[in-house]
Amino acid sequence: MTRRLTALALVLKLSLTGCCWEAEPEPDDFWGDELPPEEQETSQREPAQISDFTLPYLSGQTFDPVTCIDGVQQTVGALLYEPLFTLDASFTPQPVLCERSSCDAQALTWTFALRSAVFSDGTALTANDVLAAYRRAAESARYGARFANVASMKAQDAHTLVITLTRSNGSFPALLDVPIVKAGTENVLVPLGTGPYVYTTAADGAALTANPQWQGSSLPLERIALAAVKDNDTALSRFASRSVHFLCLDPTGTGARTVGGAVESTDVPTAAMQYLGFNLSRTPLNDTAVRRAMSGVIDRGTLVSSLLSGHGTAAQLPIAPQDADYPKTYEYRTTAEEYAAALETAGVTAARPRSLTLLVNEENAFKRAVAESLCAQLTTAALTVTVRELPWGEYAAALEAGSFDLYLGEVRLTADWDAGALLDAGGALNYGGFASEQLSGLNDAFLLGGNASAERYVKGFAEETPFAPLLFKSKTVLTPSGLVDGMTPTASDPFYGFADWRFHLSGSES
């Protein structure tokens, strides 16, 4: 969805990559913490009046996709490097450097035949290049969790990679949107890639120029200018002054800041899920019917539309609604009467009232607002729910220690929608003590694949409600108004479908 805005909240978190298992990162207080103003649509689209499409980058910092700084380096890197697979708007893996893939009946051993591709120096892509990239990725904070269930990786021949898993996964290619660089060049500032552009320098500055070795379709621009910035704050200032023209950001991250001017905003659905966590050692949260009723009584649409300014999608299940197989039929609503009845059955009545607290990290104004709304929606004559705001470090420590009743959490799922870290006994993010061999088994069967397995899993999840998914966040791509038509960015690739983008540059059309 693209919107034309006169003002938009911009935030520090500029990363578009990284759909991996991890708890929400510690917030950055670089900017003040304030809610953005209401968005206003302009009455007419303004011409861009821009002669060169320009991207910001951090001069002197590596573009290596495994180790580079989150933000603008990753955005530029999306035009320099390619993965075996990229994810489309429905989170379905689409082959890029992979010619074909197959797996055994248990989805434990995967074989990937590589496309005949060439690095920008003219050398051929080999399975050893991919193997080297994956081995580094497996050791990294950014991508490591994707390879947690990998038993072995080997180059079967120059064009074939074999990966064996410790756990069946019929959707494993969805984890392989990891950019590939030429082995041995990862330690230079600009490692070699197979992407549509190459990094060049000239008297007029650094730029991306069309890669003559690239084997893809035609490009809308032969050259993309680069503007050096010292940090993310500078990138935002340069965007406000129209000296850079493309930013990827998190509009509901910690610390919002307003930038004026005619701006177009394209929302990009992500795999970042916000959810309500339960401590199952606390009454009445140890009652399955109460957890299920709580999940059903929450008005998720209001959370997204009113509190996140529409930058997200409501979801009651731990699968992004954009996924073509999202099981919407298993969503449900609980009436106030049904909620009160579930509480009464669990022993919570007006005569025997209870109080619960909901933890939220205090640095993020959007999350504080969501937490306040949840408390209002979950409070009844018999149950009082109040917010407890904590600094990030204390919030994380309280979760680890189990010192909470409820908490508002956020996690970036992988696009196979494996929720094992949240619901498996001993899972890294299972702070509430949920344990169900049956549901864990259903999750494993869901990963193996098949519509019947998916239906059994979401039905079992809805019945037990180990946690209550609330929404999946959207990121935002900003461009000056009137600069480009046909943008189709995805969470996996900010320049997805770039060949079909049309730029309106002053003095030319492309």
Q: How does the language model describe each region?
A:
Residues 296, 312-346, 364-367:
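Structural transition elements
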Residues 56-105, 135, 192:
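N-terminal lobe/hinge region of extracytoplasmic solute-binding protein
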Residues 480-510:
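Long beta-strand-rich cores associated with HINT superfamily self-processing modules
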Residues 281-323, 458-466:
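Periplasmic-binding protein-like
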Residues 386, 391-395, 420-483, 507-510:
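Extracytoplasmic/peripheral linker and loop segments enriched in polar/acidic and small residues
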Residues 154, 200-207, 225-282, 410:
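Extracellular/periplasmic solute-recognition and catalytic clefts
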Residues 165-225, 231-234:
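Gly/Pro-rich hinge or "lid" segments in bacterial periplasmic/extracellular proteins
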